[in-house]
Amino acid sequence: MCKGGNKVNKIKVRFAPSPTGPLHIGGARSALFNYLFASRYNGEMVLRIEDTDLERSRREYESEIIDSLKWLGLGWSEGIDTGGPNEPYRQTERLAIYQEYTKKLLEAGQAYYCFCSEKELEVERQDLLDSGQMQKYSGKCRQLSMAEREEKLKQGIKPAIRFKVPAHQLHIVDDLVRGRVSFDSDDIGDFIIVKSDGIPTYNFAVVIDDVLMGISHVIRAEEHLSNTPRQLMIYDALNFRRPEFAHISLILGSDRQKMSKRHGATSLVQYREMGYLPEALFNFLALMGWSPEGEEEILSPAEITAAFSLERVAKSPAVFDINKLNFINQQYLKKIGDEELKEMLKPYLADSKYLKKIEQMGEERYELLVSTIRDYLVCLADVKEQLEVFFGDIDYAGDAREVLAGEGVIPLLQAFKEGIHKVNKVEEIKQLIKGITKTLKLKPRDVFMPLRCALSGQAHGPDLSSYIAVIGGEEAIRRIDRAIDFIKSQ
């Protein structure tokens, strides 16, 4: 369970999103892995909000993130919405706490005031770039005397505070996913821990929060690996015990580039709106980087939780395979009863142009519609596309045109028209078609195909008798008449 030298009495993890936008798929997976790890080992999870990016952070995104996590089926023992022993859980409400630890570092000579302007720093960066040197701060404000610092403060210059990086230190992390990773402090310049506006930087605040909240394991995306050496230095400078680290791989698009908007929907709320089920996304996200011991891939949240371990989390990048998500979602949809599915589809029908038709067809025919289309649904929003099959404009083109041009189609359609006004149940319609097949001495295919093409304009589709029962006899007759007129006009 816990490789490395740190022994912990209780597992405690955290998910700490920045409320700068909706919950991204990558963030949702990180939250899920934290939740699974805590649940698997009877631990606790904290939901913390890292909102030190004042320009982009929004309270509405906080609410959306919390709602998305709960919809996915995740829970936490303490956090921004539930409270707990380590309040507050929003970083901008913890500034006094960070100031206390900033003071300790300053007094110990492990941090210092930096008066460099952004313009000066940009010139310094450009000079390093032009000379091919490593991009890191020169440390010139490290050398300022007390008198020089006092003078700059008197001038009203608001300083940032930098951490004084110790020279010639090797920082080693036995990462629970990536194995041993080492960092040389000489590759890292003195870094800012508090900006000139008094707001702490991520690398500083996250360490203080994790320690004070008792976080034992930091499970996060691989892109945070480069932040780790800076955080380790702060842990050591303040004599804090380091947590265990586990950096999970990036999520790539189908082209094996980092997932972005060009690959399609990227936020959890978008998939929710499209009608993907939370259990399916839970299942799918768990399999992006983690694999169970067996071959089975359709696993319930309880089964995934019972089997989860960081030892089975891969180092290699996870690829977001929309076809796999679609397959998993279809499997979960198939498990849902018709009655429940009817209710789940209602929000997706509310703005449909065919809503009036559905309301007029009655409960029995609506139930038949749902049971007929359910196997064609990849996600709930697909119901709109399926309604086009039943109620959309018919275009006799392609295969349909060719089938309707066949010999003996008009007598077949007329025979169907004469019989359909007498029946309306699925079984009755099946018997009608069977009788026509026998009377006209045709093969079943030579009856089904022309009827389907005449009624829907398509050569393939849902069960024909169910389709006819859904649209109703009156509409079926109208379509048959139109098909006959079309054939005669050719």
UniProtKB/Swiss-Prot annotation:
- Source organism, top-level taxon: Bacteria
Q: In UniProt terms, what function does this protein have?
A: Catalyzes the attachment of glutamate to tRNA(Glu) in a two-step reaction: glutamate is first activated by ATP to form Glu-AMP and then transferred to the acceptor end of tRNA(Glu).
Q: Which CDD domains match?
A: GluRS_core
Q: Which InterPro entries match?
A: aa-tRNA-synth_I_cd-bd, aa-tRNA-synth_I_codon-bd_sub2, aa-tRNA-synth_I_CS, aa_tRNA-synth_I_cd-bd_sf, Glu-tRNA-ligase_bac/mito, Glu/Gln-tRNA-synth, Glu/Gln-tRNA-synth_Ib_cat-dom, GluQ/Sye
Which HAMAP family does the entry link to?
Glu_tRNA_synth_type1
What Gene3D superfamilies does the database record attribute to this sequence? 1.10.10.350, HUPs (3.40.50.620)
Cysteines engaged in disulfide bonds, as pairs: none
- Listed EC numbers: 6.1.1.17
Q: Where is this motif: 'HIGH' region?
A: 17-27
Q: What is this protein called?
A: Glutamate--tRNA ligase 2
Checking Pfam families in the record gives: Anticodon_2, tRNA-synt_1c
MF term (GO), any = tRNA binding
Which parts of the sequence bind ATP?
K261
Complex and partners: Monomer.
Q: Which family does it belong to?
A: Belongs to the class-I aminoacyl-tRNA synthetase family. Glutamate--tRNA ligase type 1 subfamily.
